[in-house]
């Protein structure tokens, strides 16, 4: 279940992770965060300036104020660029959303709400700041703080050593964001490690929450029914389509579990399997490294991951927990090095597997995809060879599929491997074919041979780089990280057995001693 909005900017290569600055003292439960600042009015527009249909104010040319540089990231609805303020020379990130992609009223409302929420939350140290919003005839442009310090997990991995105390400091910053959001009537709904970036490469850089595209305003006791979020981090009540802001606490608890162990608490070979595990609620505290982790840490995780949302700790109660406090009980001894290794693998593995599954889909016989080819043709109404979001939106109901708007967007994001905003034939097949067919031995062999260009029986670093770059799937550093993690015999290349283990999710390095539950 992917999130349905575009990603925020990703920064340059990461530096060793910082020891984050402490958050406000947890005993200040009733602390009032700074009042939301009113957005700075845009410069006066010409008398005949047209009104923007998204922001509802006179259109402005963002390029008159900012110089656009390189692309930083790309998502379903837009592209994020590095921009420079012409008058001051200061650098920012600009999320540019093409208005032609905002085809429905809900799309427009989502962008408006994202702008409103980011302005509303302005002033918090751990929330990325929106500096301005501009609309012209082609796009809505959101100017934001530039986060150049890298993703949360990346910096931990780069450092290579880590302690419970460091995990507690990071968790404090994450929960402080939740506390501020909830106290100001905002429900984030998509808390996950990828949505936390460090502002700078310095050791004391603050951690910043980004991407409020799924966030909503809420009142105490209000419940929601739409299925949103990301599979590993989604709360059980969200899957039951009756949930409130307590779901943010669950997501933060999942992040804390991963910070301490390197793997998610609810793990399976498919998204449906993950959802079943979430609903069952069994949390593994017996496998390594949990026996050596403090009781205080385990106590907090358990209280954040209670199945009944009413029994979960509130953000204020978490900040007062003895383990997480700045002067609290979290020990400073390093966590087992395998935690870093497993975290690295969890972050990197899916990219290679997604490409491999697409390769498998491209080699399936007509017999194996009976019905799927015709379904693709019926959805591809303009015969372009690709399916757009609009074609999915209009075509699925005609096929008898009852699916919500948010689920349609999630399907698009999950299936769109190369991130170009459309689903091609192979992407469609790999997303809709039952996994047991994709994992047949002969299909995996074909995928392996696709990467093994010289038929040596091994996939080398160069072969992997060549194949993945065709799909724009990561930089050299990430590619080398992937091969290092899949290469369990450490000979610098991937043999067929290692490739099969990766495809079938049986790699013991990912989930040691974890029993199959499905």
UniProtKB/Swiss-Prot annotation:
Entry keywords, A to Z: ATP-binding, Calcium, Kinase, Lipoprotein, Membrane, Metal-binding, Myristate, Nucleotide-binding, Repeat, Serine/threonine-protein kinase, Transferase
Please report the record's description of how this protein sits within the membrane. Lipid-anchor
Could you tell me which residues belong to the region Disordered?
Answer: 1-49
Any single biological process term in GO: intracellular signal transduction
Pinpoint the Protein kinase domain residues.
Answer: 66-324
Q: In which tissues is it expressed?
A: Expressed in roots and leaf blades.
UniProt-listed Enzyme Commission number(s): 2.7.11.1
Superkingdom, natural source: Eukaryota
Note one Pfam family from the annotation. Pkinase
Q: Does the keyword Lipoprotein apply?
A: yes
Q: Which PANTHER family match?
A: SERINE/THREONINE-PROTEIN KINASE
Q: What is this protein called?
A: Calcium-dependent protein kinase 1
The organism that produces this protein has a lineage beginning with: Eukaryota, Viridiplantae, Streptophyta, Embryophyta, Tracheophyta
Q: Gene name?
A: CPK1
